Curated annotation (Swiss-Prot):
Organism: Methanosphaerula palustris (strain ATCC BAA-1556 / DSM 19958 / E1-9c)
One Pfam assignment: Ribosomal_L37e
Family: Belongs to the eukaryotic ribosomal protein eL37 family.
Name listed for the protein in its UniProt record: Large ribosomal subunit protein eL37
Keywords attached to this entry: Metal-binding, Ribonucleoprotein, Ribosomal protein, RNA-binding, rRNA-binding, Zinc, Zinc-finger
Keyword Zinc-finger: yes
One BP annotation, GO: translation
Zinc finger (C4-type): 19-37
Keyword Oxidoreductase: no
Cofactor(s), names only, from the UniProt record: Zn(2+)
GO CC, alphabetical: cytosolic large ribosomal subunit
Length: 60
């Protein structure tokens, strides 16, 4: 198995398709889970604190 430019030409299948819940191209066709909203894994919407930018805390 080689790495680099020759193996990049073998990437021709769609890993992610459009999600039914959020509409983004983040639904993994094989794993049946959306990486953007968490559809297929949980009924709750996927959200993490590290995805939003927090306001700066004054240091003085």
């Amino acid at each position: 198995m080689s790495k680099g430019t020759p193996s990049m030409g073998k990437r021709n299948k769609k890993t992610h398709i459009a999600c039914r819940r959020c509409g983004s191209i983040s639904y993994h066709a094989r794993h049946k889970v959306c990486s953007a909203c968490g559809f297929g894994r949980t009924s709750k919407l996927r959200s993490y604190k590290w995805t939003t930018k927090r306001s700066k805390i004054p240091t003085h």
